[in-house]
Amino acid sequence: DKKIYALRDVTGTVQSIPLIASSIMSKKLATGSNCILLDVKCGNGAFMKDINEAKKLGKLMIEIGKKLNRKIAVEITNMQQPLGKTIGNKIEVLEAIDTLNGHGPKDFTEIIYSSGSTLLVLAQKAKDEVEARKMIDEVINNKKAYNKFLEWISRQGGNIKVFEKDSKWFNPQYKQEIIASQSGYLKIKSRIDFGLVAMKLGAGRSKKEDSIDYEAGIYLNKSSNEYVNKGDVLFTMYSSKPINPELQKELLSAIEFSESKHDIQTVFAKLM
């Protein structure tokens, strides 16, 4: 797959939907799973920018699965806005833990329930989405979901004590708050700009040889569509190194304020 991708890179076929589908499905089919759920991200922060192109890709991957007797479901989800309230590495793990304990952000929690219920129905563990969502409720409320997460970490030799309440596991040396200069409903115009700022903080790589700063990231104190008062903290940036003041300008240029809310869909479409 890596060799084929290198060829696509130099032949102008990176955007080829049949080649994208074969790249994704070759890896998914190799897992041996009979039921596979694919989350196709769509929007300015995703590889697939157009909903119709995303649907075309989804349908093609379902057809590939059918030819090999696999049950495939595809969800097309929104990447116009950041999902949840965190962007980074450790900071996203902590958000996942909050969600497993029933305290996650509304949009991220909805993705969990939507994807989980789709897969439970696909695998015939639940008769419909209503029953499936009740099953997810149960394992979150009785802590089975969180305890399974701890078991995964432990069985791979990880230290689960880092997730205890008094742990200093997430301990960035530098932080910078970004303050609202006006009031109104927050709108994030470009999710990709938030990803680029997180990368510049150290949460991602711009070159293969770059190292990752696991403390680096962004916390969204305010989310898209939330009403903000002038002087409120909008976002908090974290890093293990001094934070470039220019990054604040980059985030502020990626947002705007309006007098009314705007429509946001978490899941655009489901294909089965």
Swiss-Prot record:
Positions of transmembrane segments: none
GO biological process: pyrimidine nucleobase metabolic process; pyrimidine nucleoside metabolic process
Pfam (any one): PYNP_C
GO function terms (MF aspect): 1,4-alpha-oligoglucan phosphorylase activity; thymidine phosphorylase activity
Cysteine pairings via disulfide bonds: none
Any one GO CC term of the record: cytosol
Keywords of the record: Glycosyltransferase, Transferase
UniProt keyword Glycosyltransferase, yes or no: yes
EC supergroup of this enzyme: transferase
EC assignment: 2.4.2.4
InterPro entries (alphabetical): Glycosyl_Trfase_fam3, Nuc_phospho_transferase, PYNP-like_C_sf, PYNP_C, Thymidine/pyrmidine_PPase
Keyword Ribosomal protein found: no
Reaction(s) catalysed by this chain's protein: thymidine + phosphate = 2-deoxy-alpha-D-ribose 1-phosphate + thymine
Family listed: Belongs to the thymidine/pyrimidine-nucleoside phosphorylase family.
Function (record text): The enzymes which catalyze the reversible phosphorolysis of pyrimidine nucleosides are involved in the degradation of these compounds and in their utilization as carbon and energy sources, or in the rescue of pyrimidine bases for nucleotide synthesis.
Subunit structure: Homodimer.
Name of the featured protein: Thymidine phosphorylase
Species of origin: Metamycoplasma hominis (Mycoplasma hominis)
Lineage, opening ranks: Bacteria, Bacillati, Mycoplasmatota, Mycoplasmoidales, Metamycoplasmataceae
